[in-house]
């Protein structure tokens, strides 16, 4: 365990990482919360889940494709004039469309998650859920078990889902074709797939780690941190805050976009 601490100190003090003292202290404090000694065991099923999170992007895309016509489909069908001129067309009906989109999106995505998680666990068993992540790599800083890591990252993935649903609804309210919605949405979701980080610091890398595709990847072995003045946040916390804010911004804009739509 002394060797582990030496590795961590060497890693944090690597010049190329350009970590501030506050960031180093943040990671040292987190590492001090890791329970020792480590208990070893079998964890194959959980490791597969953690290493395959990015595949959920395809489920996320499928959900967004389904809800893309929620507003733009009305424009294409010419029913927008009827809906918007109705008594509750600009209020309750618009809200109902948004709520229905989120309920469908959450339920459909959850079904994908259940299938995606059950397959490796059925094949390799549930063993290892309570084991420390450090048995995979001793320098992992997060003081979590495999199950805790899966749940934390899954929470972030759901926030990404909600933000992307909000973006889809906003685009649908603003564009007259569902195809145009997807033309904008697909690159946002999948261009990061073809971009690779060259480190864990610098504007390029820190931005890349926050894009939708990369935000589904746990990156539990990387010391990715964001310093905002005197505040230091790890990747999980930063992603959660960012996508929660985006969701809160997108929803009223989507509602307003359909409400203000000019029938033509």
Task: Show the residue positions of the predicted features.
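Short helix-to-coil transition segments within interhelical loops
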Residues: 84-90
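Residues that define the loop-to-transmembrane-helix transition and helix capping
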Residues: 91, 178-179
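Terminal transmembrane helical anchor/hairpin motif
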Residues: 126-148, 179-182, 187-261
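Membrane-helix interface linkers and caps
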Residues: 75, 81-82
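Secretory targeting signals
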Residues: 3-74, 95-174, 194, 220, ...
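Transmembrane helix irregularities
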Residues: 86, 174-175
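Hydrophobic positions on the alpha-helical face of helix-turn-helix-like DNA-binding modules
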Residues: 80, 93
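Transmembrane alpha-helix boundary/hinge residues in polytopic small-molecule transporters
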Residues: 78-79, 166, 182
């Amino acid at each position: 365990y002394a060797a582990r601490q030496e590795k961590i100190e060497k890693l944090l003090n690597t010049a190329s990482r350009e970590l501030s003292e506050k960031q180093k202290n943040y990671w040292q404090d987190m590492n001090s919360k890791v329970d020792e000694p480590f208990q070893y065991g079998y964890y194959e099923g959980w490791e597969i889940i953690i290493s395959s999170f990015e595949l959920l992007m395809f489920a996320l895309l499928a959900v967004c494709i389904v809800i893309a016509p929620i507003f733009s489909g009305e424009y294409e069908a010419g029913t927008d004039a009827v809906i918007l001129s109705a008594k509750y067309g600009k209020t309750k009906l618009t809200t109902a469309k948004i709520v229905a989109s989120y309920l469908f999106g959450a339920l459909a995505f959850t079904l994908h998650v259940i299938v995606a998680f059950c397959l490796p666990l059925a094949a390799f068993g549930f063993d290892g859920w309570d084991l420390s992540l450090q048995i995979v790599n001793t320098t992992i800083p997060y003081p979590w078990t495999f199950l805790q890591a899966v749940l934390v990252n899954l929470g972030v993935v759901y926030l990404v889902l909600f933000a992307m649903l909000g973006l889809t609804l906003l685009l649908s309210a603003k564009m007259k074709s569902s195809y145009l919605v997807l033309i904008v949405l697909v690159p946002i979701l999948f261009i990061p797939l073809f971009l690779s980080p060259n480190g864990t610091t610098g504007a390029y890398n820190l931005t890349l780690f926050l894009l939708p595709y990369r935000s589904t990847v746990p990156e539990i072995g990387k010391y990715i941190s964001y310093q905002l003045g005197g505040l230091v946040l790890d990747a999980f916390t930063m992603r959660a805050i960012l996508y929660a804010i985006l969701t809160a911004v997108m929803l009223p804009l989507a509602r307003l976009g359909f409400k203000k739509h000019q029938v033509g």
